[in-house]
């Protein structure tokens, strides 16, 4: 099972009982239950990451995953039993290759990497908050805050009332 992420719509899915129930049902049949980016928020909301190590997109990852009982790890991808989570979208590729390796071994994984010509060389070393120019990081946080913060704070308030 692969749960993709995104922005506002992803967080809205954390509130959708039908979606969460479907994920819980399918999870009982999977060898791997995975997420890419903020898809881990949905797995968390389904209760599948409680007391599990997990990661997510950098934006408020620690705060949101803790809200669902997960233990945030700052990493490209994290596996904890059958639960595999990746940080951003490009980290999902790395996680997918690690799953292929887990299933089929190094030679097969290398053949997939060759077929994809997967040899990333980004133009800047700035793909995580600790390596990003502080001005760029602040700008991105402000942009995401305008979209996401009201949703996150609303969920936190609901949880405090329970």
Where are these regions (language model features)?
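Active-site-adjacent pocket-lining segments in enzyme domains
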Residues: 1-162
């Amino acid at each position: 099972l692969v749960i993709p992420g995104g922005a506002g719509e992803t967080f809205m899915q954390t509130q959708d009982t039908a979606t969460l129930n479907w994920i819980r049902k399918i999870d009982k049949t999977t060898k791997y239950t995975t997420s890419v980016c903020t898809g881990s928020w949905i797995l968390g909301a389904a209760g599948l990451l409680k007391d599990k190590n997990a990661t997510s997109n950098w934006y408020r990852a620690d705060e949101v995953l803790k809200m669902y009982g997960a233990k945030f790890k700052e990493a490209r991808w994290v596996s904890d039993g059958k639960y595999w989570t990746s940080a951003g979208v490009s980290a999902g590729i790395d996680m997918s290759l690690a799953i292929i390796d887990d299933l089929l071994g190094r030679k097969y994984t290398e053949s997939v990497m060759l077929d994809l010509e997967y040899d990333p060389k980004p133009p800047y070393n700035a793909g995580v908050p600790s390596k990003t120019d502080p001005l760029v990081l602040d700008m991105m946080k402000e942009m995401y805050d305008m979209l996401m913060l009201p949703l996150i704070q609303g969920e936190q308030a609901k949880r405090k009332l329970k």
